[in-house]
Design a protein with these regions (language model features):
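Flexible, glycine-rich linker and terminal segments associated
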Residues: 1-34, 39-42, 145-180, 184-191, ...
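Outer membrane beta-barrel translocator domains of Type V secretion systems
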Residues: 3-117
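Transmembrane beta-strand segments that form the barrel wall of outer-membrane beta-barrel proteins
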Residues: 38-50, 74-84, 107-117, 127, ...
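Solvent-exposed loop/turn segments connecting transmembrane beta-strands
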Residues: 48-60, 82-92, 116-123, 157, ...
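Feature captures outer-membrane beta-barrel proteins of Gram-negative bacteria and organelles
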Residues: 58-71, 89-103, 125-142, 161-172, ...
C-alpha cells in the first residue's frame, strides 16, 4: 500500500505515537460491528523524535478499510486515510484486491491510490503490487505526480514521480521480527533526483512495542545509521486476539498467513 510512503524529505521519518484517548476503543468497536468497515483507526500522537520543525508537534491520522466484496479467496477493499503532520494535511483514497490461495499460505495483491495535500494542493496517483508469505514479503509501488510546480508559503515545490520496492524476510523471534531491504527513487523531470537504499531490522519486543535499526545510503553514497522505537495501541484492542511470542524455530515451510 502507497499510503505510508512520503516522497523526498519524509523518506526516513519514524514516529513514536503515544495514545491520547483509550476510550475511543468503544467508538471503533460500534462502527465496525454495524458497517462494512473491517478496520478503523484513529491515532493521536506526539513527535517524540523532533522531526517536525514547524512547531506543530502532534501527528493525527484517521484510517479506515472498507470491505467492498469478499469471498473465501478474494478480498476487494477501499482504504481511505487523512493525516496531519509537519503543518501539512494529506488525504489518501485507495482501492485494492487481495487473493489468498486455498492453503492460505500465499497472498497476492494489487492496489491503486490517489494522494491530495490539502494545503499545497499537490496531487499524486500511484499503484502497487504485493506478494506475501510467512517467510518473505515483497512490495512495490509506482508514484505519478499529477500537479506540477506550486508556490506554497513562498517556496516553489514540485511533486515528484518515483517508485519504491521493499523485500522483507520474517524471523521467528519475539512477537514478530524481520530484516528488510528497501530501495526508492524520486525525480521531478527537470534533473533533480533523490535515491535511497535502506537495510534494516525490526523486532516487536513486547506487544505493540517495536524497535528498529537501519542503515541508509543516498545517491551520493552518504551513509547514516538510524534507530527507532514505536509504541502503538490499536483501537478496539479488546477484541483482538492476544499476541504470543514466536517459538524461535526456523522453518522453510510456508505457514498460513490469513491473520496478516
Amino acid at each position: 500500500d502507497g499510503n505510508a510512503e512520503e516522497a523526498a524529505k519524509n523518506e526516513a521519518a519514524t514516529y513514536s505515537l503515544n495514545a491520547a484517548n483509550s476510550a475511543l476503543d468503544d467508538v471503533e468497536d460500534n462502527i465496525v460491528a454495524t458497517t462494512p468497515f473491517t478496520h478503523l483507526e484513529l491515532s493521536l500522537g506526539s513527535d517524540a523524535f523532533g522531526l517536525d520543525t514547524t512547531g506543530t508537534t502532534t501527528k493525527t491520522e484517521l484510517l479506515g478499510v472498507l470491505r467492498l466484496h469478499e469471498t473465501k479467496n478474494t478480498f476487494v477493499f477501499n482504504q481511505t486515510s487523512i493525516s496531519s503532520f509537519d503543518s501539512r494535511t494529506t488525504a489518501n483514497l485507495g482501492f485494492g484486491v487481495r487473493h489468498i490461495n486455498d492453503d492460505e499460505t500465499v497472498i497476492m495483491g494489487v492496489n491503486a491510490f490517489y494522494d491530495y495535500e490539502l494545503d499545497s494542493e499537490h496531487k499524486r496517483t500511484g499503484f502497487g503490487v504485493e506478494l506475501l508469505t510467512s517467510l518473505l514479503e515483497m512490495r512495490a509501488n509506482k508514484y505519478n505526480a499529477v500537479s506540477g510546480t506550486i508556490t506554497h508559503d513562498g517556496i516553489n515545490e514540485t511533486a515528484l514521480d518515483g517508485h519504491d520496492i521493499k523485500i522483507t524476510g520474517n524471523l521467528p523471534y519475539f512477537y514478530s521480527s524481520n530484516i528488510y531491504f528497501k530501495q526508492s527513487e524520486f525525480k521531478d523531470g527537470a534533473g533533480y533526483k533523490t535515491e535511497n537504499d535502506e537495510w534494516g531490522f525490526e523486532a516487536e519486543i513486547a506487544p505493540n512495542v517495536t524497535i528498529g535499526i537501519a542503515q541508509q545510503k543516498d545517491g551520493n553514497n552518504t551513509k547514516d545509521t538510524v534507530a527507532s522505537i514505536r509504541y502503538s495501541i490499536p483501537l478496539g484492542a479488546n477484541t483482538a486476539p492476544t499476541k504470543a511470542k514466536q517459538d524461535g524455530k526456523w522453518s522453510t515451510s510456508l505457514k498460513p498467513i490469513r491473520e496478516k
